[in-house]
């Protein structure tokens, strides 16, 4: 109802946005993403929850040619080590074997078949990678060595919170860390002017045609969201829902305060 009330196509700063605001960080990520398409390998993207990691990768992968790349997205990572490989096998169209050796051999054969027979590169995106079992980080380099003994035939992106980078810097995971070719971190949009541009871009993308927030309301939003796009979007959407029964076509300070209380 609030979308119709404000004349919007989709929620501001929501998952439906196809063009993300960029002050340079996304352009850099796009460049590094292309690196790992041209020269397959492992990338690490970290940042606080809600900073936009998944949204950024969603936009980047949306334009991938399905005849050239096979996108495999894994968001449920709280599994045992072998279950992750079984998930990969299923995504590749395989019946997953019970034993690790047979499972690895089948995955290797399928990926080589994709490369040699169809010129297709699998792109495996593992979201919430901070929840992966630590055994996976010890195991994965051995899998990469086994599966791609002569050439790299799959790109892997690990997405996770900042603690993931700290984990991978520990000595037990040195082999895994050495396989990471790209490391990037997205940070909150904390500076006032940049945050204002972010929100205004999100509102315009959603279809807003007039100013909805005063400078003071924008500052309340910035402080409450801590510069995190997802949280800013949740607050704006909540404030809009609260505005509908009041008949308001803008979001005054008191409405932002009310939205903050609702979401606390």
What would you call each of these model-derived segments?
Residues 1-40, 257, 261:
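A short, basic N-terminal segment
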Residues 7-8, 175, 193, 197-264:
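C-terminal alpha-helical "lid" subdomain
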Residues 8-14, 69-71, 79-98:
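Conserved NTP-binding/hydrolysis module of P-loop NTPases
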Residues 38-59:
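Walker A/P-loop nucleotide-binding motif
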Residues 43-46, 73, 125:
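Short hydrophobic/aromatic beta-strand immediately N-terminal to the Walker A/P-loop
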Residues 61-63, 164-179:
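Short regulatory helix/loop adjacent to the ATP-binding pocket of P-loop NTPases
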Residues 74-77, 167-171, 181-194:
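Conserved AAA+ ATPase "SRH/arginine-finger" region at the nucleotide-binding site
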Residues 80-83, 95-139, 148-152, 189-195, ...:
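Mid-core helix/loop region of P-loop NTP-binding domains shared across ATPases and GTPases
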